[in-house]
């Protein structure tokens, strides 16, 4: 793609309309950071932007991200990249965000602040129950967010069953009978009634960082759910620094039964990884299902 291609011309025109001034004489460079979208740094003498590009059929996926970032921004709890605009051509869809110079941190106080801000996000609740006003994606997998008053039914019907159905279509047959899984799930909630909290939905270390010491999260799979889902995922691919968890628990203590539910919540993400990346995750999914059933 060159700067005079229909795609980049459309991006420049959409930015021009969004900032109400001509966005001209620009350049762009590919940047890393994901396997779902093509990503670029786009800049001219006055502005720098982060641009996600995908096929035209993915415009609603990008629209959901645009809306999710706006919703998180409105909470004033944690920083996210400001979404500027989105659009599509015949072949492509695109999302334009502000450019942030993101860095990892080895400072204890930064991770403590991250824990505090995630806790503040989780204090945002919904009176409508568990779900969101639109479906979105987890990675590129469709994620159903129809509203439920009951968290257990939401997690089974909107999270585990769709992923298992897709996994079976791709050749995965769990070693644990799913009927035993469905029987086990409610037992993990006998003494715990979750509150519908605003959750990031895909909170692993690759979707959080720092900009000049300020915690930033991005690439959301947003919905209102049990806040434990976010904390569980921070532990799935290696825990965050201890200061994150200490600070989170100081501001919003976890229920003592969280450790028992962690495998249930991470099962969703492992099934999704199987559906996205293949059979390497089948063994891990079997182990997590066996853990959940054994707990009950």
Model regions: which residues?
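Regulatory N- and C-terminal appendages and interdomain linkers associated
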Residues: 1-24, 92, 280-296
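An alpha-helical support segment within catalytic cores of ATP-dependent transferases
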Residues: 6-19, 126-198, 296
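Short acidic/polar mixed-charge low-complexity motifs
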Residues: 22, 45-49, 214
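Short secondary-structure junctions
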Residues: 22-31, 254
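ATP-binding pocket architecture of kinase catalytic cores
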Residues: 29-149, 153
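A glycine-centered beta->alpha junction motif in the catalytic cores
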Residues: 48, 89-108, 123, 157-161, ...
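A cross-family signal for key residues in well-ordered alpha-helices
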Residues: 70, 235, 266
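Active-site Asp-x-Gly
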Residues: 144-156, 165, 195-198, 205-263, ...
């Amino acid at each position: 793609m060159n700067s005079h291609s229909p795609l980049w011309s459309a991006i420049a025109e959409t930015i021009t309309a969004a900032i109400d001034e001509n966005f001209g004489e620009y350049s762009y460079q590919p940047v890393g950071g994901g396997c779902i979208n093509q990503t670029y740094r786009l800049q001219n003498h006055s502005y720098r932007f982060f641009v996600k590009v995908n096929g035209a059929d993915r415009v609603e996926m990008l629209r959901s991200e645009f809306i999710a970032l706006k919703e998180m921004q409105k909470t004033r709890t944690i920083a996210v990249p400001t979404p500027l605009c989105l659009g599509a051509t015949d072949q492509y869809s695109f999302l334009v965000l502000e450019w942030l110079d993101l860095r990892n941190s080895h400072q204890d106080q930064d991770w403590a602040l991250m824990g505090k801000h995630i806790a503040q996000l989780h204090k945002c609740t919904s009176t409508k129950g568990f779900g969101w006003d639109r479906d979105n994606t987890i990675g590129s997998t469709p994620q159903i967010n129809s509203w439920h008053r009951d968290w257990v039914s939401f997690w089974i019907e909107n999270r585990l069953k769709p992923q298992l159905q897709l996994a079976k279509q791709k050749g995965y047959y769990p070693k644990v009978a799913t009927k035993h899984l469905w029987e086990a799930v409610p037992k993990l909630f006998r003494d715990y009634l979750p509150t519908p909290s605003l959750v990031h939905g895909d909170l692993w270390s690759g979707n959080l960082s720092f900009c000049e010491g300020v915690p930033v999260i991005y690439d959301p799979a947003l919905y209102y759910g049990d806040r434990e889902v976010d904390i569980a995922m921070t532990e799935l691919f290696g825990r965050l620094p201890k200061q994150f968890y200490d600070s989170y628990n100081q501001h919003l203590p976890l229920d003592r039964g969280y450790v028992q539910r962690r495998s249930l919540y991470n099962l969703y993400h492992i099934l999704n990884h199987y559906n996205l990346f293949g059979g390497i995750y089948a063994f891990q999914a079997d182990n997590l299902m066996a853990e959940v059933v054994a707990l009950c």
